Amino acid sequence: MKEFTYLQDELETMKQQGTHQTLKEIDSKQSSTVTLNEQSVIQLSSNNYLGLTSHPRLMKAAKEAIDEFGAGTGSVRTIAGTMTMHERLEKKLAAFKKTEAALVFQSGFTTNQGVLSSILTKDDIVISDELNHASIIDGIRLTKADKKVYGHANMEELEKILKKSMNYRVRLIVTDGVFSMDGDIAPLSEIVRLAEAYDAFVMVDDAHASGVLGENGRGTVNHFKLDGRVHIQVGTLSKAVGVLGGYVAGSAVLIDYLKHKARPFLFSTSHPPAVTRACEEAIEVLLDEPERIETLWENAAYFKEKVIGLGFEVAPTETPIIPMMIGDEALTFRFSKALIERGVFAQGIAFPTVAKGKARIRAIITAEHTKEELDRALTIIEEEAKKLNILD
């Protein structure tokens, strides 16, 4: 049988450069601490912002759903895979996001792909922030629309593109709400102002803002008091919500169209009952326990202040994403490995996830972290950084 020698060669190069990674196997519930390699470590790499992955109400809802409805649905949504709970979840999401309707996909990644590839044609143009998530980039690649990229959060450049693109049928501005690698928030008020001035649509990917920003975690649109002025809101059910999946919220016309045209929706089996019911319960928890979001922000502010005090260069974050900039990729991964060995799970992030020379340790703070855990992590981070001459 023919071998994949060309792939093996590339893997060997990655190993020589110190950028080859192995998957970390966790053997516990996802929480502020996890079991990794039979060792308890402080978790600083999870997107479990509010600690909902192991919330008793979500776990109870999932268990009861399995007992009543089974392990799976056995079909796609458009044939025999739509249960009452799927429709109920989508109505809850629409109400939560203050839109007319919503549609759930298998992941946030496929949501962006499904939306972008469905609603744009060769007569249209999509205008994207240069630091948008990979799922947006891949979704744009699936369209036949023209593409323009503006410099990160550069509103002058965005306006120039809008002025030069008046002849297109549809112009769609796409942006992350919170940028996942740097933790900064999109200037959405200005984006919406420009969109309204130049008759363009706006799409926001709120993966890292849902459950984090806005009233009860409603996201970036609500954070900027722009409810009703953003055409497409994409979110995940796998980060702050704590379960699995993605969704799009918007007008009834948009959602009805996507039900007929979005290929990831049309050709994927629907969410199993346990996942669906847990997602439903998570929305209720967001409404019932706003103190979780308050604690999240308190912990994030505390950790950020301490990290800067240690002397780290921190990306211009405005959220619980705290990127400690290292630069060199191999050094970043050595640092990450040293931290894990000392009991701090803080994953190194490097090219192609971020630009070359922009490698970093990305810490994500959660509502579950105690001050004692954060202080312990900070002590270990400082000690290992000094050993590697990252800090003086």
Curated annotation (Swiss-Prot):
SUPFAM superfamilies: PLP-dependent transferases. The keyword Electron transport does not apply. It catalyses: 6-carboxyhexanoyl-[ACP] + L-alanine + H(+) = (8S)-8-amino-7-oxononanoate + holo-[ACP] + CO2. It comes from the Bacteria. Keywords: Acyltransferase, Biotin biosynthesis, Pyridoxal phosphate, Transferase. Pathway: Cofactor biosynthesis; biotin biosynthesis. Pyridoxal 5'-phosphate binds at residues 108-109, 180, 205-208, 236-239. It holds the Pfam family Aminotran_1_2. GO terms for molecular function: 8-amino-7-oxononanoate synthase activity; glycine C-acetyltransferase activity; pyridoxal phosphate binding. Transmembrane segments: none annotated. The modification N6-(pyridoxal phosphate)lysine is found at residue 239. Its cofactor is pyridoxal 5'-phosphate. GO terms for biological process: biotin biosynthetic process. It is an enzyme of class 2 (transferase). Substrate binds at residues 133, 353. Its EC number is 2.3.1.47. Belongs to the class-II pyridoxal-phosphate-dependent aminotransferase family. BioF subfamily. NCBIfam families: bioF, gly_Cac_T_rel, PRK06939.1. Catalyzes the decarboxylative condensation of pimeloyl-[acyl-carrier protein] and L-alanine to produce 8-amino-7-oxononanoate (AON), [acyl-carrier protein], and carbon dioxide. Homodimer. This is 8-amino-7-oxononanoate synthase. It comes from Bacillus pumilus (strain SAFR-032). The lineage of its organism: Bacteria, Bacillati, Bacillota, Bacilli, Bacillales.
